[in-house]
Design a protein with these regions (language model features):
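N-terminal basic/disordered segments at the start of proteins
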Residues: 16-48
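Hydrophobic residues embedded in beta-strands of well-ordered beta-sheets
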Residues: 34, 47, 169, 179-180
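Non-catalytic pre-domain segments flanking phosphatase-related domains
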Residues: 1-23
Length: 274
């Protein structure tokens, strides 16, 4: 399970270097939050994280309910990126130096081109929207990096890497470390939350039927590429994964946590029954 992101903007304890030499930064504009990471890369490709920041965002709520980003959503994003820009200036980095990517909320927003233009004009950042297949590949690279000292997790048996986002769930299937397929499923926490809100006007069993139907459809799609009963390693990424790891262990992890299968299933069942 991936490393924990802080929930508020804060300065790193590492200290602020005086120049941008060897420094890189990236920003992800996601459905539920906007995240920044600053890192130093040495001549051998080694990575040292210097700073992280994250802020909650309403973009997914806008797009998945109205189909477009609201004016308030745009203003909120500009304010967050402007605060990130101030932090980056301390590292000698300018908005034009930063890789900024947008995921499912921006992919689906009907006014995404206008949004990107406004962000560039008002905050100075150029936003690149990544398609779902690239997002899944980036997820794979992140997992490989996090598990570089424990590569057998991905090579000793068939594996599934899964990230549940606000708008989509990204899934990759690996057969002894080799990618078999990747899928972007239209199942996300914000979409499900909207269905739960609507289910207040439906019979009590509606939401359970909705989830079972969507999960069964997803499993049928995945099983065409690799029998799911042959998957023995399950890698879960994202805030829900970090929450589960914390609840089951009582502590945070710098890169990943290994959870007992039976305990995880029991925990998931308890959450479903709440």
């Amino acid at each position: 399970m991936s490393d924990v992101q802080p929930q508020k903007l804060q300065q790193s304890k590492e200290g602020m270097p005086g120049s941008a030499e060897g420094l890189h930064a990236a920003i992800e504009i996601g459905s539920t939050g906007i995240r920044l990471i600053v890192a130093e890369i040495d001549s051998k490709g080694g990575l040292k994280i210097l700073d992280r920041a994250s802020k909650q965002s309403r973009l997914g709520r806008d797009v998945f309910t109205m189909g477009s980003i609201s004016r308030d959503g745009l203003r909120e994003t500009v304010a967050i990126l402007s605060s990130f820009s101030e932090l980056l200036q301390g590292y000698g980095l300018q908005p034009s130096d930063i890789q900024v990517i947008g995921t499912s909320a921006l992919r689906e927003a009907s006014n995404r081109d206008t949004f990107i233009d406004r962000i560039n004009l008002q905050a100075g950042f150029h936003v690149r929207i990544v398609e779902d297949i690239e997002e899944t590949y980036l997820m794979y690279l992140a997992v490989k990096k996090a598990l570089e000292d424990e590569r057998s997790f991905l090579t000793r048996s068939n594996a599934m890497i899964l990230e549940v986002g606000g708008g989509t769930t990204e899934v990759m299937l690996l057969k002894k470390g080799q990618m078999v397929s990747s899928h972007s499923l239209s199942i996300g926490t914000l979409r499900m939350d909207e269905q739960i809100r609507e289910s207040a006007r439906q019979p009590p069993q509606f939401i359970e039927m909705y989830l079972e139907s969507n999960i069964k459809t997803a499993c049928d799609v995945l099983a065409e590429d690799l029998p799911l009963d042959s998957v023995h390693t399950f890698v879960l990424i994202g805030s829900d994964a970090r929450f589960a790891a914390y609840c089951l262990s009582g502590k945070n992890f710098s890169h990943y946590a290994v959870l007992d299968r039976a305990q995880f299933i029991e925990f998931a069942d308890s959450m479903a029954n709440m």
